């Protein structure tokens, strides 16, 4: 399997990499949060742009991105607008969503963008090509905060992301039972062993699914999300605890 290298970080080998999400409503809070996050132990900074109030002002959005880049220049920066339909804070049109991601790509400030699989096939393919032409990596994602589909469907979505040339396919699902967590882990393992030619990220959410956030190295998930302050999704644990467990499992 090929790995993905962003800055000096190699994703897809060794212990899962830790991603933290920064969710700030304005420039002042972006700055203060960035200073607080700078001391935390993580690998990738995800900026959840859907929490940013002044979204219609592209200059303001990019000014915030510049603050993050300058505060943590060594950390890979993942630019994510999570749509309302996939658990995000704001609903915007597909056109606005694509334009926002293109502006982030054009800025030269971000290393990766998150692109939702179900945005529309043509728009997704075009945006992936645009990102790659500007040396920006794509995490292609799908989130279901209500249920976990069958393993075959999980694998089909991850394979579709791969066929669309995502650098890293990602799926996050809500379990209704412990067996749903096993379904996610089974699908992850099968994808990783039989189909994946690049790193994937998978997780089962909430307290029920927390094992999936810890056992990525065993089942084939290359990264996991931790919380510096407020969790960005149900089931996230603190980055310090997360690093401890990931290291124990890696060294065992």
Curated annotation (Swiss-Prot):
Annotated GO biological process: 3,4-dihydroxybenzoate biosynthetic process; amino acid biosynthetic process; aromatic amino acid family biosynthetic process; chorismate biosynthetic process
Single GO MF descriptor: 3-dehydroquinate dehydratase activity
CDD domains from the UniProt entry: DHQase_I (cd00502)
Active site as annotated: 143, 170
Keywords recorded for this protein, A-Z: Amino-acid biosynthesis, Aromatic amino acid biosynthesis, Lyase, Schiff base
PANTHER family per the UniProt record, alphabetical: 3-DEHYDROQUINATE DEHYDRATASE
Record's protein name: 3-dehydroquinate dehydratase
Annotated organism of origin: Escherichia coli (strain SE11)
């Amino acid at each position: 399997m090929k790995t993905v290298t962003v800055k000096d970080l190699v994703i897809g080998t060794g212990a899962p990499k830790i991603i933290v999400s920064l969710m700030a409503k304005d420039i002042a809070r972006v700055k203060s949060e960035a200073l607080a996050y700078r001391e935390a132990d993580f690998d990738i900074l995800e900026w959840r742009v859907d929490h940013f109030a002044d979204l219609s002002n592209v200059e303001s959005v990019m000014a915030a991105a510049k603050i993050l880049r300058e505060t943590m220049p060594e950390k890979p920066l993942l630019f994510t607008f999570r749509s309302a339909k996939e658990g995000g804070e704001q609903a915007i049109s597909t056109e606005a969503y694509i334009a926002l991601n293109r502006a982030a790509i054009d800025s030269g400030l971000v290393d990766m963008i998150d692109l939702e699989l179900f945005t529309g096939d043509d728009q997704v393919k075009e945006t992936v090509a645009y990102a790659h032409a500007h040396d920006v990596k794509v995490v292609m994602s799908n989130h279901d905060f209500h249920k976990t589909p069958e393993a075959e469907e999980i694998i089909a979505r991850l394979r579709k992301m791969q066929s669309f040339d995502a650098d890293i396919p990602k799926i996050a699902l809500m379990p209704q039972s412990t067996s749903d967590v096993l379904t996610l882990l089974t699908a992850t393992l099968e994808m990783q062993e039989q189909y994946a030619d690049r790193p994937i990220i998978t997780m089962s959410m909430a307290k029920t699914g927390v094992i999936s956030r810890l056992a990525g190295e065993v089942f084939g998930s290359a990264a996991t999300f931790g919380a510096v302050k407020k969790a960005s999704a149900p089931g996230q644990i603190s980055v310090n605890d997360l690093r401890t467990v990931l290291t124990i499992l890696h060294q065992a």
